[in-house]
Amino acid sequence: MTEQKQVKKPSARRRARECTVQALYSWAVSGNTAEQVELAFVLDQDMDGVDKPYFRKLFRQTIENIETVDFSISPYIDRAFDELDPIETAILRLAVYELRFELDVPYKVVINEAIEVAKVFGADESHKYINGVLDKIAPALGRK
């Protein structure tokens, strides 16, 4: 008898975070407005299993607060923003937005979700970099 490993489906919020990272990446590299990116994303991507209201909130609020978010990240990265991988930038922006503004989400959940999203979309070791940066930012934001 063979055992099949059951693949656990990501939660609706995890899927919302994954979609938010993709949309933030698209927004950063395309030069399109947030509204254009959001509309195209919702029309073109598979949104099954996504907490759509949470996706919209995360995407819109991260961009609305981008200066504060980037200011919170800058002291804790080892290079200039334009030298970061755009996916890493999107993951950090989302996580820092959540750490700073979504206080009902425990900081450990935010960091773990960012690591898991980095494993899906980032380079081989990017989840380690994301973890290291967020481990420094969380206490600075009073979240540890």
Swiss-Prot record:
InterPro entries listed in its UniProt record: NusB-like_sf, NusB_fam, NusB_RsmB_TIM44
Keywords: RNA-binding, Transcription, Transcription antitermination, Transcription regulation
Signal peptide: none
An MF annotation (GO) of this entry: RNA binding
Top-level division of the source organism's lineage: Bacteria
GO terms, biological process: DNA-templated transcription termination; transcription antitermination
Gene Ontology CC, one term: cytosol
Family as reported in the entry's similarity comment: Belongs to the NusB family.
Task performed by this protein: Involved in transcription antitermination. Required for transcription of ribosomal RNA (rRNA) genes. Binds specifically to the boxA antiterminator sequence of the ribosomal RNA (rrn) operons.
Listed name of the protein: Transcription antitermination protein NusB
Organism, as annotated: Haemophilus influenzae (strain ATCC 51907 / DSM 11121 / KW20 / Rd)
Native organism taxonomy: Bacteria, Pseudomonadati, Pseudomonadota, Gammaproteobacteria, Pasteurellales
